[in-house]
Each structure stands twice: as structure tokens, then as C-alpha cells.
Amino acid sequence: MPLRVELKPFERIIVGDSVIINSGTRTSFLIDGDTPILRERDTVTAETANTPAKRLYHCVQMMYLKNDVARYRTSYLGLLKELQAACPDQGDLLGAVDQHIAGGTLYKALKEIRKLLKREERAPA
């Protein structure tokens, strides 16, 4: 089933190894296939990955976009342990992330980590 994507003016979306930049008007289109897709607003860059949850997200994002779990596995496991130590109360959520990684459902793992990012934003500094 194709994915329907709606983009605002000048919004960006990553499709595989390419970035699509919308023109000055709102648009929608369908994408059919297994290529990884992420909106720019749902990405974390290496430069902005400045918290344990953001570093984990960035690592899983790279697994997803590059379709290469093995390449990032060692980094992922280290970041997961770091986050488990820093946030022991998030064990269930981190367990769900790990299950998604093991099952190959990387986009679902990213969605779980986004919950951590939201909690991290709300936490007092």
C-alpha cells in the first residue's frame, strides 16, 4: 500500500539516500516501495545529538536510512546501555525499542525513541 505524503512549502523529506525539497506550494504524492522515508523534522543530526536519547535516536535513524543494522549495532548497544543507566525508569520503553531493532522494524523503534525525546524535553534541566 503506497504511503501518502503531504509536504508544506519548502519542507524536506529523506527518501533513501536522497532529500526531496518541496517547492513554494503545498503538495502531496504517493510513495510505493520499501525505501526508508523520514521527514526532515523527524531527523536528528550528528551535531544535534547532544543527549543520550538523541544519540540513540540518531544511531537507529542511521540503521534505518542506510538499511544496515550490523554496521551500527555496537554503537547502538553502547548507547542503549548508557540510556538504561541514565533512565532506569524507562526500561519498558527501551525494551520495546530493542525488540523492534531485533525484529527489523526500525521505523517503529524510532517512534518509540521519539517518546523518550518528548519526555527528555519536558524534564527539568
Write out the residue ranges for each language-model feature:
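Terminal leader/tail segments of proteins
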Residues: 1-125
